[in-house]
Amino acid sequence: MKGILGKKVGMTQIFTDKGVVIPVTAVEAGPMVVTQIKTVDKDGYNAIQIGFEDAKEKALNKPKKGHLAAANVLKKHLKEFRVDSVEGYTVGQEIKADVFEAGAKIDVTGISKGKGFQGPIKRHGQSRGPETHGSRYHRRPGSMGACSYPGRVFKNKKLAGHMGSVKVTVQNLEVVKVDADKNLILVKGAIPGAKGSVVTIKEAIKVSK
């Protein structure tokens, strides 16, 4: 499976030859470096580990420095991707955005924007109560359940709580354009996370027919 790490730059729009507007998200994908290779004989499966975004030496602990010494790099983020074969990969090899091409279908994983503590209307899309005519029910969560039996609040009751800042995957997005020289990938539509957040881009596992 092909996969890379990238940093969300932001959203913009491009125009097709027919003048159709396409909203796209720009992702700075690379350059990355192969930091480790795993094989069936040694590890039980084939995989490559890649490092993304340069780090200062003082920001890394000794175990991580020792791990990255073979590739002779200092990287903040490490990610492992399983592959069918490790042929063609070497430790220290540079990987750029051109592993994907325009028209490819991808899955993008990132950490969603944190919204803090939110009520059931914003967090779950619950309907609100009337504003006027003597109503005292506006933005409250509603019934907690029966009184004497079962005498408790059921699990998964939609209540207020922490919203966002969770791992989210958006599937079957389309790569609109790849600029290998600038290490940019333009993805159709929105992807999870805030500007500057790190995202994982993989081949789509459920390709639309």
UniProtKB/Swiss-Prot annotation:
The lineage of its organism: Bacteria, Bacillati, Bacillota, Clostridia, Peptostreptococcales. It comes from Clostridioides difficile (strain 630). NCBIfam families: L3_bact. GO terms for molecular function: rRNA binding; structural constituent of ribosome. Pfam families: Ribosomal_L3. Residues 117-142 are annotated as: Disordered. One of the primary rRNA binding proteins, it binds directly near the 3'-end of the 23S rRNA, where it nucleates assembly of the 50S subunit. It comes from the Bacteria. Gene3D superfamilies: 3.30.160.810, Translation factors. This is Large ribosomal subunit protein uL3. PROSITE patterns: RIBOSOMAL_L3 (PS00474). The keyword Manganese does not apply. Belongs to the universal ribosomal protein uL3 family. GO terms for cellular component: cytosolic large ribosomal subunit. Keywords: Ribonucleoprotein, Ribosomal protein, RNA-binding, rRNA-binding. Part of the 50S ribosomal subunit. Forms a cluster with proteins L14 and L19. GO terms for biological process: translation. InterPro entries: Ribosomal_uL3, Ribosomal_uL3_bac/org-type, Ribosomal_uL3_CS, Transl_B-barrel_sf.
